[in-house]
Amino acid sequence: MVNDTFEQALQNAINIARLAPSSHNCQPWSVHYDAATRCGEVSIDRQRALKGLPSLEREMLMSCGIFFEYLSTLLKHSGYPLDWQWVGARQNGSSGMLISFAPSAPCVADLVAYQQWVQRISDRHTVRTAYQPTQVNEQQQAQLYALFDRSPVTCDIKYGEATRHDVAFLTANYASLDFADQQAWRETYHYIRFNEQQAAEDGFYLHHLFGPVSCGFRWFFRIAFHPRLSWLAKRLRLPASMAKGLAELVVEGPQYLALSLEHESDENLFIAGMKLGQLWLMLQSWGWSLHPLSVLVQHATARCALADTVRLTGLPVFFARFGQHRQSGIPTPRRAWQRILTTTQHSFSPENGADVKQP
């Protein structure tokens, strides 16, 4: 790694940063780098971004923020810190470009820090099973809060029996909204991989949600929750049953955290993602995990009820339970780095004296 060129270091960093978490594991990021100008950009890949609910744009921006936090930190530790600036997706129409970047002056690589980040990113998985009852202590809380100093992001940490029952009550009442919006559920269903013997590059298998499941359960879920059979699922009260089961898990906590923004701009959501990426790896270094409860922030009614009931600083853009995991999570499918990075090389054409771009 010490003698890597920037281009090689970028490939290596993307190969690790691609393990960043994202909603439905849709991996909505893309990177382009121009070798001649030594400039690059990170964009939302609109072909991959979730669109089922307007609120999912928040999650796409935050997911890209997590990815860039991992990418830029790995490059810094490999000796290539980045200069970057916010450009903004909506100002660029369909391009989805979020930030532009360029390598700044090279520095001495920190191989120990690099390997620590590689290990933590590789070991980090979303854990949706029960956690140990271990309570977050004051020192740990201070470390988590410190991550958000001098940032537009506010972090609230909540715990206690009353909070656990409040969050479980909200989950039981609102989690069935995952199935209520036909377009949103159709999109979710699209990312479920039912054949565990077939390799995939995105999405998730049922065992990521429920742990090991039988072939019979997979077939039942595939049919009963098919978007075209939503009437059957409702008649069998399956959404309510799923919500009740999730609430029984959520009530165990043992604690919860929320991120909110005073000004909910695209740039601040991206920064919130970067900070969340740091927080997730800090928890990983403790042997702890996060379980996002996205349904409580994706729907306006649930989001307002959560903020009021749990007395959050503001409307949450992210909410999760967290704690010391009893067992590590399971890796999810991933795209190869070659599917994320595109490059432009410039070569001189002696016939016409013009630059020739080579994808």
Curated annotation (Swiss-Prot):
Q: Name one GO biological process term.
A: antibiotic biosynthetic process
EC id: 1.-.-.-
What did gene disruption experiments reveal?
A: Cells lacking this gene show a white phenotype, and produce 2-methyl-3-n-amyl-pyrrole (MAP) and 4-hydroxy-2,2'-bipyrrole-5-methanol (HBM).
Q: Which cofactors are reported in the record for this sequence?
A: FMN
Task: Recite the UniProt keywords alphabetically.
Answer: Flavoprotein, FMN, NAD, NADP, Oxidoreductase
Q: So which domain of life are we looking at?
A: Bacteria
- Quote the pathway field: Antibiotic biosynthesis; prodigiosin biosynthesis
User: Could you tell me which InterPro entries the record lists for this protein?
Assistant: Nitroreductase-like
Query: Could you cite one Gene Ontology molecular function of this protein?
Result: oxidoreductase activity
- Family of this protein: Belongs to the nitroreductase family.
Instruction: Please explain the role this protein plays, according to its UniProt record.
Output: Involved in the biosynthesis of 4-methoxy-2,2'-bipyrrole-5-carbaldehyde (MBC), one of the terminal products involved in the biosynthesis of the red antibiotic prodigiosin (Pig). Catalyzes the oxidation of the hydroxy group of 4-hydroxy-2,2'-bipyrrole-5-methanol (HBM) to yield 4-methoxy-2,2'-bipyrrole-5-carbaldehyde (MBC).
Q: List the protein's name.
A: Probable NAD(P)H nitroreductase PigM
Q: Whose protein is this, by species?
A: Serratia sp. (strain ATCC 39006)
Lineage at the top is: Bacteria, Pseudomonadati, Pseudomonadota, Gammaproteobacteria, Enterobacterales
Its gene name is pigM
